[in-house]
């Protein structure tokens, strides 16, 4: 469209201008364009129904020329809608996301947890919490929190610490720079996360004469920062000097779409590749250099190599405490680090040699600079032996024949066998992410979707919705524990409403398996971690399940097909039925609360009470003092 077409102004409300602007925003990388904000989630109340709600309706039934559709989906919970948007963004490798709107007060505050999840995971979401009247004439309005010390602060200021960009629109003119900066942050690979623009309910509906040029198509180019020559030379020198280098591949490798380059680099150099939760699948599990998960929930192969490594090459990792085993994983006293990361904040961790660059660009440059380099034969043989030994343990965990209830690892083994290379498995919290990181044999970077930065119970059900919207061609399988289910089940209704075909696997063990085991190991005797009916004495001694609680029936009441099974063979048959169905299906299976889980080889720092009258806690504290001795800063 010519520049002349954008001369003059158009009179729109702030909300209408927001939707029209967002409908024409695009992201681009490697020559491929995407609609940056292809749709909207929203729950309406008096704070947004006549503002953004009206604007979305108008976009749907009376759009103007040059205004793209902004399809609206009605969710059931404000936190859930943000989780769905985050999962959508993660599945698109951060090239797209959804906008989310909520009403004033409790509706908007419900989005804070989702915002924190997105920012912690470095994935973009765009949030529009509604706010109190900017004019302050109706004051206090319904659902407004009053602060007697200032009239400036509202509950939406809670979004500030969990957002990568926060603004409040008190005048229409402020919208223009605010939205432009919002798009900048959403598409910045180093700065992305939750972007929050609070909108007072009166300002949303206020009319203004907007420059037409504001609504032209804009393409936001997602950058691939090249490697600085001097930084490359320093990294190459470190690698050449190392005898036992180990790559730790994080989510940044996948978001950069650098999997092919990682495989080629590993093949050329022989350097083994361990993965984090976010990075699993960046290298296929059957690659000769793939050594699986590393850290507190990693496997023996990755952890044994990490124990002795003299150089850690971190690619796109934020080094969470699970990756470093709370700073006990890398035991070589002379270990050094080279960190390749698009964010200097992450590249600087562990006193590393910093390579602030895109993962793909850096791997290409390193491969060229190390063309004549390969680890020695003895190290290659050790890598192969570790891989073989751990593969045998994985196979055992997948085929335990445990009874009377199956172990959840057997369910994971069945799923690992049944899922296709482009299908997606989703999880976030409890004992399952630990088992999955240790055991899951990821074939592609698409397949493994575990949110373990914020590890938010309740993520799994809405995340399946978001992932399926992003990849309708993939089978999306979300593994849900009964603890997570009871936190946030209501987006099952949204899935049924939208006719979204996903598969939920509900593992019911009547408690918190992960925290129960952690509680026991820290001397707290699984207190408050089992779903049991209170008896006449201590509920810890009462093993009776709560009568009348039926999660399978509850899921069916949301409009989901439910198949109840009790054995692994029945589970496989049920999965095949769910796979060919055109409706969302939940497969319900009871599993053993007490495992068994994969063998662990690394520690996690969870502090134990330093003084106690309980013998179990006293013993746990002695173990804790012993186990934390290897902790150190990497300087």
Identify the role of each PLM range.
Residues 2, 6, 170-173, 211, ...:
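Phosphate/pyrophosphate-binding active-site segments
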Residues 2-374, 378, 414, 418-421, ...:
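N-terminal alpha/beta PP-like core and its mobile active-site loop of ThDP/TPP-dependent enzymes
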Residues 35-36, 378-381, 478-483:
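Short alpha-helical "patches" and their helix-cap loops
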Residues 38-52, 387-462, 467-468:
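Active-site diphosphate/adenylate-binding microenvironment
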Residues 136-150, 347-348, 356, 363-364, ...:
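Thiamine diphosphate
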Residues 163-166, 394, 398, 562:
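Short amphipathic alpha-helical interaction patches enriched in hydrophobic/aromatic residues
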Residues 249-251, 315, 429, 480-483:
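Glycine-rich beta-strand-to-loop/alpha-helix junction loops that act as flexible
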Residues 266, 305-306, 408, 488, ...:
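Active-site-proximal structural scaffolding
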């Amino acid at each position: 469209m010519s520049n002349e077409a954008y001369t003059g102004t158009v009179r729109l409300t702030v909300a209408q201008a927001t939707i029209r602007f967002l409908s024409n925003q695009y992201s681009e990388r490697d020559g491929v364009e995407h609609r940056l904000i292809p749709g909207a989630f929203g729950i309406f109340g008096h704070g947004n129904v006549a503002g953004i709600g009206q604007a979305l309706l108008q976009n749907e039934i009376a759009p103007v020329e040059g205004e793209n559709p902004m399809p609206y989906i009605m969710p059931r919970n404000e936190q859930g809608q943000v989780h769905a948007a985050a999962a959508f963004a993660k599945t698109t490798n951060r090239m797209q996301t959804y906008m989310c709107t909520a009403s004033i007060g409790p509706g908007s505050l419900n989005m804070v947890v989702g915002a924190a999840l997105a920012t912690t995971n470095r994935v973009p979401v765009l949030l529009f919490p509604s706010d109190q009247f900017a004019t302050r004439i109706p004051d206090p309005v319904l659902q407004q929190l009053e602060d007697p010390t200032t009239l400036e602060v509202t509950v939406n200021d809670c979004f500030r610490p969990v957002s990568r960009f926060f603004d409040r629109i008190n005048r229409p003119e402020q919208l223009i720079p605010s939205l432009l900066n919002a798009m900048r942050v959403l598409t910045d690979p180093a700065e992305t996360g939750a972007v929050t623009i609070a909108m007072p309910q009166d300002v949303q509906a206020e009319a203004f004469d907007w420059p037409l040029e504001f609504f032209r198509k804009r393409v936001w180019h997602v950058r691939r920062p090249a490697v600085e020559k001097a930084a490359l030379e320093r990294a190459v020198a470190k690698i050449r000097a190392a005898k036992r280098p180990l790559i730790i591949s994080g989510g940044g490798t996948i978001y950069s779409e650098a999997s092919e380059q990682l495989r080629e680099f590993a093949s050329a150099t022989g350097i083994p590749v361990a993965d984090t939760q976010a990075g699993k699948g960046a290298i296929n599990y059957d690659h000769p250099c793939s050594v699986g998960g590393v850290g507190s929930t990693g496997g023996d192969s990755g952890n044994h190599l990490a124990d002795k490594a003299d150089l850690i090459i971190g690619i796109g990792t934020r080094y969470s405490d699970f990756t470093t085993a709370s700073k006990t994983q890398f035991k070589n006293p002379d270990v050094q680090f080279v960190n390749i990361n698009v964010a200097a904040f992450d590249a600087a961790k562990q006193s590393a040699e910093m390579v602030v660059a895109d993962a793909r660009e850096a791997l290409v440059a390193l491969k060229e600079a190390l063309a004549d380099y390969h680890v020695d034969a003895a190290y290659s043989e050790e890598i192969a032996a570790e891989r073989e030994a751990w593969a045998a343990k994985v196979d055992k965990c997948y085929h335990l024949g445990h009874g009377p209830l199956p172990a959840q690892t057997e369910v994971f083994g069945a799923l690992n066998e049944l899922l296709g290379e482009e299908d997606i498995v989703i999880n976030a919290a409890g004992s399952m992410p630990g088992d999955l990181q240790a055991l899951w044999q990821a074939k592609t970077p698409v397949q493994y979707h575990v949110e373990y930065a914020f590890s938010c119970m309740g993520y799994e059900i809405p995340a399946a919705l978001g992932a399926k919207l992003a990849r309708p061609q993939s089978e999306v399988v979300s593994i849900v524990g009964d603890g997570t289910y009871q936190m946030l089940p209501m987006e099952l209704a949204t899935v049924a409403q939208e006719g979204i075909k996903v598969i939920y696997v509900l593992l019911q063990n009547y408690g918190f398996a992960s925290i129960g085991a952690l509680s026991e190991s820290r001397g707290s005797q699984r207190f408050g971690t089992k779903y049991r009916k209170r008896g006449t004495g201590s509920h810890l001694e009462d093993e009776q399940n709560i009568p009348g609680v039926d999660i399978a029936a509850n899921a069916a009441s949301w409009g989901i097909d439910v198949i109840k099974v009790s054995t692994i063979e029945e589970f496989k048959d049920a999965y095949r039925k769910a796979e060919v169905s055109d409706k969302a299906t939940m497969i319900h299976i009871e599993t053993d609360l007490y495992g068994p889980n994969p063998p662990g080889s690394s520690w996690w720092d969870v502090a134990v009470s330093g003084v106690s009258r309980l013998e179990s806690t006293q013993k746990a504290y002695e173990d804790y003092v012993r186990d934390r001795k290897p902790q150190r800063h990497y300087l």
